[in-house]
Regions:
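Hydrophobic transmembrane alpha-helices and their immediate loop junctions
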Residues: 1-155
Length: 159
């Protein structure tokens, strides 16, 4: 993704895709943590769909410029989860990428059933959102340092 060679008709849908997906992704982490009993995201003001609480300005700009970026991570305290099972933290970690997959499927439905016809670059919101969400899900599942995949990779079953 090179922001300097993109028309406004393509840039605006990408910005919308970025805002929607990063916000929903981080909200999903916060919601799942609260469901498992950790009130840290609520106390930090992260249990909201307000994009200003979730978007990191530098990470968002980097995502637009080079295709790799980040949002503000949701604080989660694994010691306050009601279930001390390793799957609880794994569920919190996987809720973000799962939310990206759900958003990708939801945006693909109108395209699949021809409810929305993309015409040139002026109607590129849904294809851009779909591609962005799948890419974002892939990046989050990679087992790199400080990524979601690493948290899940080292969790062991209790048996």
């Amino acid at each position: 993704m090179n922001i300097f060679n993109i028309s406004p008709a393509v840039l605006i849908p990408r910005l919308l895709a970025l805002i929607i997906s990063l916000t929903f992704h981080e909200y999903s982490h916060a919601w799942m943590a609260v469901k498992f009993g950790d009130e840290t995201p609520r106390w930090a003001g992260r249990l909201t769909l307000n994009p200003l609480k979730h978007l990191d300005p530098i990470g968002s700009l980097t995502l637009l410029l080079v295709g790799f970026g980040w949002a503000k991570p949701v604080p989660v305290n694994p010691y306050t989860l009601k279930r001390k099972h390793p799957a609880a933290l794994m569920a919190v970690a996987l809720s973000g990428p799962l939310s990206n997959f759900i958003l990708a499927v939801v945006t693909a439905i109108p395209l699949r059933f021809a409810l929305v016809q993309p015409i040139g670059t002026t109607s590129s919101l849904l294809p851009s959102l779909f591609e962005f969400l799948l890419y974002f899900m892939y990046i989050n599942l990679r087992s790199e340092e400080r990524r979601v995949g690493k948290k899940c990779r080292y969790r062991r079953a209790p048996y």
